[in-house]
């Protein structure tokens, strides 16, 4: 079975389409586990007297309390810090509390303004340094969500580290939507070419780069426009945030993790009661910085497919690790990172 066959299986069995669902169903079927769809379109697996469910990263392996703890980013930070895990200082403010929010933010500028729950990188404003930008960002987020999370800006290189069964199994360095100059093409032409590459279907998870107000803002910050011609090898960013849903690149970084990184993430996983599957957004210190990693947030519906289909680097077999934990009777070896 390959990915296209797995997607056809989902269609035939009333399971919600998606690469994550297809990967998990595929790996379960390979082990002889019975797979069906349930009334909610989830992957329903049955073997050894146990029923497991999966849908777009969510699984009933995780108890509900974990989801309640992590749905709001400020709550997650307050759970992690007392357990020795570095996490950013942050606070949520209602739509009418912009003055109080600015008073909280001003002493620790620059800050990040974003929704308090996951939005896949949308409406996230990074590196706010003045009251005008703060007010515009706060109003934009609060209009949609009734308030905004204000958070200290932590410098570093963002990674998504996936934990299965308490162990780190893979890591991806997510690079914000970008193009690399060839010395002759404009930024707009480079974006069009990268979007054409993403349309061919060979990598099913990477999204188009949108040319919108967020792209304009980021280009302006770099002193560029869509008509600019970057030099050969010059990387131009179209987003300040690194989310794949807004056109970012997934670059495998599993082998780059240090023992300190792995220990920190696994300690964070233990701080969340009953967690079996989670995606940890971790800021690793910039090169040459001796600081410790920082856990930005925890996602209870992690995108497993980013590890299977990186834009650059080695694919990692994460779906099989999940089946190992769901049905250890079918596991053939220990996949824990050393």
Language-model features, listed with the residues they occupy:
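A short beta-strand motif that forms the metal-chelation/ATP-contact edge
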Residues: 44-54, 160-170, 288-306
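A long amphipathic alpha-helix within ATP-dependent nucleotide-binding catalytic cores
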Residues: 193-288
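Short, surface-exposed charged micro-motifs
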Residues: 32-34, 160, 281
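C-terminal active-site "lid" helix and adjoining low-complexity regulatory extension at the edge
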Residues: 249-263, 270-277, 284-338
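Short acidic (Asp/Glu) and glycine-rich catalytic loops that position anionic groups and cofactors
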Residues: 3-5, 241-247, 297-302
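ATP-binding N-terminal substructure of ATP-dependent carboxylate-amine bond-forming enzymes
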Residues: 1-71, 75-78
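Generic non-transmembrane alpha-helical segments
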Residues: 27, 31, 83, 104, ...
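Active-site nucleotide/adenylate-binding loops and adjacent lid/helix of ATP-dependent enzymes
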Residues: 52-56, 61-209, 259-262
């Amino acid at each position: 079975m390959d990915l296209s066959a797995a997607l056809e299986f989902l269609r035939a069995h009333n399971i919600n389409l998606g690469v994550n669902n297809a990967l998990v169903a595929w790996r379960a079927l390979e082990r002889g586990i019975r797979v069906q769809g349930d009334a909610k379109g989830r992957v329903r697996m049955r073997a050894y007297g146990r029923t497991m469910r999966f849908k777009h990263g969510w699984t009933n392996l995780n108890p509900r309390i974990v989801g309640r703890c992590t749905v709001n980013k400020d709550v997650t930070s307050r759970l992690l810090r007392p357990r020795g895990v570095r996490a950013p200082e942050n606070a949520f403010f209602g739509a009418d509390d912009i003055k109080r929010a600015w008073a909280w933010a001003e002493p620790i500028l620059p800050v990040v303004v974003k929704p308090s729950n996951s939005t896949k990188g949308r409406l996230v404003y990074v590196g706010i340094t003045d009251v005008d930008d703060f007010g515009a960002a706060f109003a934009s987020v609060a209009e949609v969500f009734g308030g905004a999370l204000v958070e200290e800006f932590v410098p570093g290189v963002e990674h998504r580290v996936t934990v299965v069964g308490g162990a780190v199994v893979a890591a991806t360095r997510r690079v914000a939507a970008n193009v690399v100059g060839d010395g002759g093409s404009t930024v707009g032409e480079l974006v069009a070419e990268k979007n054409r590459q993403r349309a061919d279907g060979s990598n099913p998870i990477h999204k188009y780069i949108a040319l919108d107000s967020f792209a304009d803002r980021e280009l302006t910050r770099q002193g560029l426009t869509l008509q600019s011609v970057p030099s050969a090898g010059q990387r131009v960013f179209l987003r300040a945030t690194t989310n794949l849903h807004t056109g970012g690149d997934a670059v495998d970084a599993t082998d780059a993790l240090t023992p300190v990184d792995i220990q920190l993430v696994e300690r964070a996983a233990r701080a969340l009661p009953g967690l079996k599957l989670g995606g940890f957004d971790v800021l690793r210190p910039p090169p040459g910085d001796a600081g410790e990693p920082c856990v930005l947030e925890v996602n209870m519906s992690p995108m497993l497919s980013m590890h299977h289909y990186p834009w650059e680097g080695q694919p990692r077999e994460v779906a099989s690790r999940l089946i190992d934990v769901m049905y250890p009777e079918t596991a053939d070896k220990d996949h824990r990172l050393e």
